[in-house]
Regions:
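A short glycine-rich beta-turn/N-cap micro-motif
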Residues: 39, 63-65, 131-136
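N-terminal leader/targeting segments and the immediate start of mature chains
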Residues: 1-52, 103-107, 159-167
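Gly/Pro-enriched, hydrophobic low-complexity segments
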Residues: 107-166
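Hydrophobic alpha-helical segments, especially N-terminal targeting/anchoring helices
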Residues: 69, 101, 128-129
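An acidic-aromatic
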Residues: 44-90, 145-147
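A short, amphipathic edge element
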Residues: 87-100, 149
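Short, ordered beta-strand-loop transition motifs
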Residues: 61-63, 98-109
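Extended lipid/amphipathic-ligand handling interfaces
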Residues: 31-32, 58-60, 150-152, 156
Length: 167
């Protein structure tokens, strides 16, 4: 007995059966993003513009404050506690596990992530550790390439930070 099933029906069944699997690729990414965001950390952000000019800035997030170093080297306290950070990750649209790598000697899983956060659309790569932390990210936004490196072991707020707004 031969059953003739239209290819479109097979494709539809495949899409329905694999959609939950594809959607679950974002679960570990979102979990690591939230976990990393709610853990004190230091960030080194390197921006490379379309002409190849690099700008390196730093951020320190403690339990009760966020410190940002501007391109001129000055530090500012932003009065943003970890509990005040936005947990809305609905803009993380698609995620795909693309391999494994290491960051600073720590094994990671690499994900390719398509994001639309507050109108900023980007494609990023995230390196997620077995401790459920984002250790590195790379992406392009409006023609500039960004590399962000996270450090959860060395979190010391700058002594010379001025309150944002000059108060």
């Amino acid at each position: 007995m031969h059953i003739n099933i239209p290819r479109s029906l097979i494709a539809l069944a495949f899409a329905v059966l694999t959609a939950p699997t594809l959607a679950d690729e974002c679960a570990p990414v979102k979990s690591a993003m939230l976990n990393s965001g709610h853990t004190p950390h230091t960030v080194i952000l390197t921006q490379t513009d379309g002409q190849g000019k690099k700008t390196v800035t730093r951020q320190v997030q403690t339990v009760d404050n966020k410190y940002v170093q501007t391109a001129d080297g000055k530090w500012y306290a932003m009065n943003i506690a970890i509990k005040d950070l936005d947990d809305d990750l609905s803009g993380v649209l698609t995620c795909r596990r693309s391999g494994s790598d290491s960051v600073s000697g720590e094994a990671t899983v690499v994900y390719e992530v398509h994001v639309n956060l507050q109108g900023q659309v980007s494609d990023q790569k995230l390196w997620v550790s077995s401790k459920n932390m984002v250790l590195k990210s790379e992406g392009t936004i409006e023609g500039s390439n960004y590399t962000t490196e996270y450090d959860f072991a060395h979190v010391t707020p700058p002594a010379n930070a001025k309150p944002m707004g000059g108060k």
